[in-house]
Regions:
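A cross-kingdom marker for long, charged
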Residues: 134-137, 165-166, 174-175, 187
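Composition- and surface-driven signal marking solvent-exposed, interaction-prone regions
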Residues: 137, 146-151, 180-181
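Catalytic histidine neighborhood in serine/cysteine hydrolases
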Residues: 157-173
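Catalytic histidine-centered segment of alpha/beta-hydrolase-like enzymes
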Residues: 171-181
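Feature representing long, continuous alpha-helical segments
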Residues: 119-122, 147-150, 186
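Short, amphipathic alpha-helical "lid/cap" segments that border enzyme active or binding sites
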Residues: 181-188
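Alpha/beta-hydrolase fold catalytic core
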Residues: 1-143
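Active-site-adjacent alpha-helix of alpha/beta-hydrolase-fold enzymes
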Residues: 142-162
């Protein structure tokens, strides 16, 4: 409990009460609760004041609030410059879309829902000995944590000798951190 608390910044009491199983949303809410903030899901380096500090969940993803509007604005500007006419406004996220998405190949549960491609990767590797995998992840990403990706690959018949893991000092979108983006480009070229 002491080490867990030390490495995460969470109180020993919270870690103990969580039975050493702290969910990402609980971590986001609890880490800066005393200051009235929650940290971001896509990038936990971002923080945002919560309406109710005592609430169970963060009000929003502070990281998405930090950069979504810039990306949407840039996309609409680019569409205009290249002559693309859109009828609907592009949105960076849409709860209706998530709720109506066809989640084939998903676990049989309500949330979190995700598509797990790793059994297919393992199958493809067994059929093609040249098939290699590159996994890049940001260490501040609480939406798709690095160790989760690694665990999925280990658990689904993937030949780990043909997998390259690359961790970046960034969140989910490593291109938001210039040194990470530069290194990523070098690695994939």
């Amino acid at each position: 409990v002491k080490e867990y608390s030390f490495y995460t910044g969470l109180s020993e009491e919270f870690v103990r009460n969580s039975d050493l199983r702290v969910e990402a949303s609980d971590f986001r809410k609890e880490l800066l609760r005393d200051e009235g903030f929650s940290v971001g899901r896509a990038d936990s380096r971002y923080k945002m004041k919560d309406y109710v500090a005592a609430g169970q969940y963060p009000d929003t993803d502070a990281s998405m609030e930090g950069f979504s509007s810039a990306y949407v604005s840039a996309l609409h500007t680019w569409f205009s410059e290249i002559g693309v006419e859109t009828v609907m406004l592009y949105q960076s996220s849409d709860r209706d879309l998530y709720n109506n998405w066809d989640w084939n190949s998903t676990q049989d549960q309500k949330w979190p829902r995700y598509v797990n491609p790793t059994p297919h990767i393992g199958y493809a590797q067994r059929g093609n000995e040249e098939f290699k995998v590159y996994v890049s992840c940001g260490i501040y990403d609480l939406a798709t944590p690095c160790f989760t990706a690694e665990n999925f690959l280990y658990d689904n018949g993937v030949d780990m000798e043909r997998v390259i893991f690359s961790e970046f000092e960034a969140g989910h979108m490593m291109y938001n951190h210039q040194p990470s983006f530069d290194r990523f480009l070098k690695e994939v070229n």
